[in-house]
Amino acid sequence: MLENIRDAVRKFLTGSTPYEKAVDEFIKDLQKSLISSDVNVKLVFSLTAKIKERLNKEKPPSVLERKEWFISIVYDELSKLFGGDKEPNVNPTKLPFIIMLVGVQGSGKTTTAGKLAYFYKKRGYKVGLVAADVYRPAAYDQLLQLGNQIGVQVYGEPNNQNPIEIAKKGVDIFVKNKMDIIIVDTAGRHGYGEETKLLEEMKEMYDVLKPDDVILVIDASIGQKAYDLASRFHQASPIGSVIITKMDGTAKGGGALSAVVATGATIKFIGTGEKIDELETFNAKRFVSRILGMGDIESILEKVKGLEEYDKIQKKMEDVMEGKGKLTLRDVYAQIIALRKMGPLSKVLQHIPGLGIMLPTPSEDQLKIGEEKIRRWLAALNSMTYKELENPNIIDKSRMRRIAEGSGLEVEEVRELLEWYNNMNRLLKMVKRRRGNIDKLFGGKIG
């Protein structure tokens, strides 16, 4: 799945096919790749319908080429499919923190218990593992081996067939020994299709242990079948979250991820390999960046981020025009950094007021002068203190000299920056409260 979509992105961005035809071909490739990854067909066609709708309704910002803009929309919509901005909270909310792992047989639950213990141990927590899976003969030995490998204590009773009794004793002992995080590996004797029995046992164990988190472990290879299991689990345990394992070994990982997200359950981690450290917190945007090929879309995402940051500065300017506060040099600094993210300065310099190059078509020499001025002003801003950026009025002649020395500039250049800043604040107060005036001030709309 990942390779197919990544190849489609590269082909789309570097190919010579006419734009409209290239878009149609890409959408078809995207649909095929997602469906072959076992993503629900309805979800796939809903996704591509949203992409097409945005293409028809929205206009690309001037800092993005049409193809770049299209890929940024694909990135947005795919991120929503896999969970959007939701960031799982993996930090314990109290100590000790009891985690109960549940999952059907073969889901990789015991291996995940070891990985989870290692994840928290690396972060400085004292971790204890409880082996309460009595139905799989090798479960205790496997957990003991993992515990020895990572230096984590394991409690288990190989001759006791009562999982609830073992879990209760193990938790009590680890609480007494002042463990920060206690992970209970519960029984996994039921297969897929036997969710009712699994959830009944989970409830029984939950009532005794009163854990702080219940995590359902799902094998990625079941694809969209994960929907039924995750849905029933989410209804039975609203505080619970999900770990999807074996993402590296199946083409159905996208199907499992999208299915779990569709239930409303939170995906906390994904397993990305067999090694003990191959467990990562799940982040939809990071996952989608990987799908699309981070090297191919990084510059596009950087431009979009710059555009978002620039919009924040524009809103701040609107507030200043309404008499709410004052533009600071920190705002100016943020504005310049945002513009730099949006592409070569030669393409965005005309949007910065007061540089004397706001012509319909600035000459190459004018652009070079402007770029150099921006670079030198940034050096000056980097040499100022936090207080000076917030209130430039405190900068006296002595500080001007120090700032100039620290940034390799002439004192006159620092003075010019401060004069430009003061002029800009005066301009903002004079301009009427209309978006058109702000755009005029900035040489035209960017977004």
Swiss-Prot record:
The keyword RNA-binding applies. InterPro entries: AAA+_ATPase (IPR003593), P-loop_NTPase (IPR027417), Signal_recog_part_SRP54_M_sf (IPR036891), Signal_recog_particl_SRP54_hlx (IPR013822), Signal_recog_particle_SRP54_M (IPR004125), SRP/SRP_N (IPR036225), SRP54 (IPR022941), SRP54_GTPase_dom (IPR000897). One of its GO terms (cellular component) is signal recognition particle. SUPFAM superfamilies: Domain of the SRP/SRP receptor G-proteins, P-loop containing nucleoside triphosphate hydrolases, Signal peptide-binding domain. It catalyses: GTP + H2O = GDP + phosphate + H(+). It is an enzyme of class 3 (hydrolase). It is found in: Cytoplasm. Its main location: cytoplasm. It holds the Pfam family SRP_SPB. One of its GO terms (molecular function) is GTPase activity. Gene3D superfamilies: P-loop containing nucleotide triphosphate hydrolases, Signal recognition particle SRP54, nucleotide-binding domain, Signal recognition particle, SRP54 subunit, M-domain. GO terms for biological process: SRP-dependent cotranslational protein targeting to membrane. Keywords: Cytoplasm, GTP-binding, Hydrolase, Nucleotide-binding, Ribonucleoprotein, RNA-binding, Signal recognition particle. GTP binds at residues 103-110, 185-189, 245-248. Disulfide bonds: none annotated. Its EC number is 3.6.5.4. Part of the signal recognition particle protein translocation system, which is composed of SRP and FtsY. Archaeal SRP consists of a 7S RNA molecule of 300 nucleotides and two protein subunits: SRP54 and SRP19. Composed of three domains: the N-terminal N domain, which is responsible for interactions with the ribosome, the central G domain, which binds GTP, and the C-terminal M domain, which binds the RNA and the signal sequence of the RNC. Belongs to the GTP-binding SRP family. SRP54 subfamily. Involved in targeting and insertion of nascent membrane proteins into the cytoplasmic membrane. Binds to the hydrophobic signal sequence of the ribosome-nascent chain (RNC) as it emerges from the ribosomes. The SRP-RNC complex is then targeted to the cytoplasmic membrane where it interacts with the SRP receptor FtsY. This is Signal recognition particle 54 kDa protein. It comes from Saccharolobus solfataricus (strain ATCC 35092 / DSM 1617 / JCM 11322 / P2) (Sulfolobus solfataricus).
